[in-house]
C-alpha cells in the first residue's frame, strides 16, 4: 500500500490544505449534524410511505391529478421528491433506480421509461439489517457482474452500527437474473485492513475487476481526510492484494466546508477509463464533482491516475441548482448515449438532508475524449428523453357497469396483492400495459409494480381471486380482449372465464374475480390510454 503517492495534478501549484480537528470534522460529516440527521430520517420515512393523497386503496379519497405515463419526448427534473446518492441501471427494457434510504429496507424503482420511473413506487429488495449494519444506510449501487455463481446482480452499499466510525461497505448478491432480487448478504468488503469505508463501486479494466471507495489512511475516521482508493477483486465481494490511494482532497475546491473525496464511480468511453468523484462537504452548496483519468499501466499505481485540476460539475446558481454530486452513470436504452444521475438541492441553504433530489442529464464528450457533464440543468428545463426509449402506452381499464377502473389494492407493489376496482385517480397502480403475446392473448402489466394480472393459483373455478404476480407468461396471466358490441370481455386463457367485479358491487375497493362469461355490463370493459 502506498498512501502517500496520489494522483498527479498537472500544472497545479501547492495549495494550502485546510486542517480540521477530529471533533470539527465529525460535526461536519453527513448525518453527524443533528438537524441533517433529523431531515435524513424524515426523508427516509417519507420515501417509504405512500402519501395520504395516494392511499386510495386504504379507503381514503385521492385528489391526485392524472399521471401521464406514456413515453414522452421530454421530461423535467427531479425524478422524485427525495433521493440522495442515486444510481440507475438500464437493463432488458427497464430502468432500475436506487438511492440512500438511511435505514433499511433497500428499495428499487423499476420502469420502462423516464416518465414512468418518476411515477414508480419503491419496491423493497432487501430487509436484513441487524444491529451491526442497522444504520446510516447510504449510497446503494447496482452492478451486473460475472461471479462464482455466474452472472448475477450485486448491490454495494454503506452501513454501520450507528456511529460514523463503524461505517463499512457491504455486498449483496442476487439469486438469479432479476435486478429486483431476491438478494443474499455476502459480507463486508474492505482492503488489507478493516478501516472506515463508504461509497463502494466497481470498474473492470483490461478484463480485471476492481473495487473503488472512499476510505481513510489511518484507523480513526475523525483523524483522516476521506480519500479515493482502489483495490483488485478476486470476486465481486472479496479483495485481493493491497489498496492504493489515488486521490486525496488537496485542492482548494475539494476542501470547502470539509476536506472530502467520496462517491467514486467509473465511466468508460472509446477504451478510456475515468473515475468521477464528489468533493467538499455535502452540507453546503459547493459539493461538486472532480475527475481522475487512468493513463495506462498498473491500475494499482497512483501514478497511473491523473487528477483534473478543476471541477467538472458544480453549482449553477442561475439555474437554482446547488451541491450537485454523488453521481452514477447509465446508458440510454439503445446504448448510444451516456447519462449522469446525481443529486442536488434547490436552495443554497439546504444540505445533507431529505431535500436532495435525483436528477439526470445527458453526457457528451470533449475533444480530448473526457466526459463533458455540462452544467446542472434547472428543474424547469425540458430534457429530451434518452435515445431509444420505447413508446409504451399505459391504459386505464374501466368497468362498464360501475365506471370504475382496475386497481391494485394496497400494498400495491406486493406479490399476491389483490386486484379490485376504484374511482379513477391517475395513480400508477391504476394503469396497465397491454403486452401482445403474439398468440391472440395479452398480458396486463402494472405500471406501478411491473407485475402482471394473474388468476390465483391457475384456478378454473368461479369466484377465483385475481392478483398481481411477477410476470412469467403462464396461461393464468394471459387474457383475450373479446369484443362484445362496443365493449370487451377480459377472458382468462387458463379457465376460459371472464373478469368481473365480485357481487356486482359498485363500491370502491370491491375485488375482482373470474366467473363464467356473460354479456351483462358487469362483465364488460373499456380501455383508454392514460
Predicted feature residues:
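N-terminal non-cleavable signal-anchor helices
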Residues: 10, 20, 34, 39, ...
Amino acid at each position: 500500500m502506498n498512501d502517500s503517492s496520489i494522483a498527479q495534478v498537472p500544472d497545479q501549484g501547492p495549495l494550502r490544505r485546510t486542517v480540521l480537528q477530529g471533533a470539527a470534522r465529525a460535526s461536519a460529516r453527513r448525518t453527524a449534524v443533528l438537524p441533517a440527521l433529523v431531515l435524513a430520517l424524515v426523508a427516509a420515512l417519507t420515501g417509504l410511505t405512500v402519501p395520504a393523497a395516494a392511499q386510495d386503496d386504504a379507503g381514503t379519497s385521492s385528489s391526485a391529478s392524472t399521471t401521464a405515463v406514456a413515453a414522452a419526448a421530454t421530461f423535467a427534473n427531479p425524478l422524485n421528491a427525495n433521493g440522495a446518492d442515486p444510481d440507475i441501471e438500464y437493463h432488458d427494457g427497464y430502468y432500475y433506480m436506487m438511492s440512500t434510504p438511511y435505514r433499511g429496507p433497500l428499495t428499487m424503482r423499476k420502469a420502462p421509461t423516464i416518465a414512468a420511473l418518476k411515477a414508480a413506487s419503491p419496491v423493497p429488495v432487501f430487509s436484513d439489517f441487524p444491529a451491526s449494519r442497522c444504520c446510516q444506510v447510504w449510497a446503494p449501487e447496482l452492478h451486473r457482474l460475472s461471479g462464482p455463481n455466474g452472472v448475477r446482480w450485486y448491490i454495494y452499499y454503506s452501513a454501520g452500527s450507528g456511529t460514523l466510525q463503524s461505517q463499512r461497505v457491504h455486498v449483496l448478491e442476487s439469486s438469479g437474473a432479476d435486478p429486483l432480487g431476491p438478494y443474499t448478504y455476502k459480507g463486508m468488503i474492505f482492503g488489507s485492513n478493516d478501516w472506515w469505508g463508504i461509497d463502494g463501486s466497481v470498474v473492470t479494466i483490461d478484463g480485471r475487476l476492481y473495487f473503488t471507495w472512499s476510505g481513510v489512511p489511518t484507523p480513526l475516521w475523525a483523524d483522516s481526510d476521506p480519500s479515493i482508493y482502489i483495490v483488485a477483486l478476486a470476486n465481486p465481494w472479496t479483495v485481493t492484494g493491497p489498496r492504493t490511494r489515488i486521490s486525496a482532497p488537496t485542492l482548494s475546491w475539494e476542501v470547502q466546508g470539509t476536506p472530502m473525496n467520496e462517491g467514486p464511480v467509473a465511466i468508460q468511453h472509446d477504451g478510456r477509463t475515468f473515475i468521477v468523484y464528489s468533493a467538499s462537504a455535502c452540507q453546503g452548496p459547493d459539493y461538486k464533482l472532480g475527475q481522475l483519468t487512468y493513463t495506462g499501466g498498473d491500475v494499482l499505481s497512483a501514478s497511473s491516475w491523473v487528477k483534473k485540476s478543476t471541477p467538472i460539475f458544480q453549482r449553477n446558481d442561475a439555474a437554482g441548482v446547488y451541491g450537485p454530486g454523488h453521481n452514477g452513470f447509465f446508458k440510454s436504452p439503445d446504448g448510444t448515449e451516456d447519462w449522469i444521475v446525481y443529486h442536488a438541492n434547490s436552495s443554497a441553504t439546504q444540505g445533507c438532508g431529505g431535500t436532495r433530489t435525483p436528477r439526470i442529464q445527458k453526457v457528451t464528450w470533449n475533444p480530448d475524449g473526457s466526459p463533458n457533464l455540462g452544467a446542472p440543468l434547472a428543474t424547469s428545463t425540458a430534457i429530451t428523453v434518452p435515445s431509444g426509449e420505447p413508446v409504451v402506452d399505459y391504459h386505464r381499464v374501466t368497468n362498464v357497469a360501475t365506471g370504475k377502473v382496475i386497481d391494485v389494492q394496497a400494498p400495491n407493489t406486493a406479490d399476491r396483492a389483490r386486484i379490485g376496482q376504484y374511482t379513477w385517480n391517475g395513480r400508477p397502480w391504476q394503469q396497465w400495459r397491454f403486452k401482445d403475446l403474439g398468440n391472440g392473448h395479452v398480458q396486463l402489466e402494472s405500471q406501478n409494480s411491473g407485475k402482471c394480472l394473474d388468476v390465483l393459483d391457475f384456478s378454473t373455478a368461479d369466484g377465483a381471486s385475481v392478483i398481481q404476480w411477477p410476470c412469467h407468461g403462464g396461461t393464468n396471466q394471459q387474457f383475450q380482449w373479446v369484443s362484445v358490441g362496443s365493449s370487451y370481455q377480459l377472458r382468462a386463457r387458463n379457465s376460459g372465464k371472464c373478469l368481473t367485479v365480485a357481487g356486482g358491487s359498485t363500491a370502491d375497493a370491491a375485488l375482482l374475480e373470474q366467473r363464467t362469461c356473460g354479456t351483462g355490463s358487469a362483465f364488460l370493459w373499456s380501455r383508454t390510454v392514460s
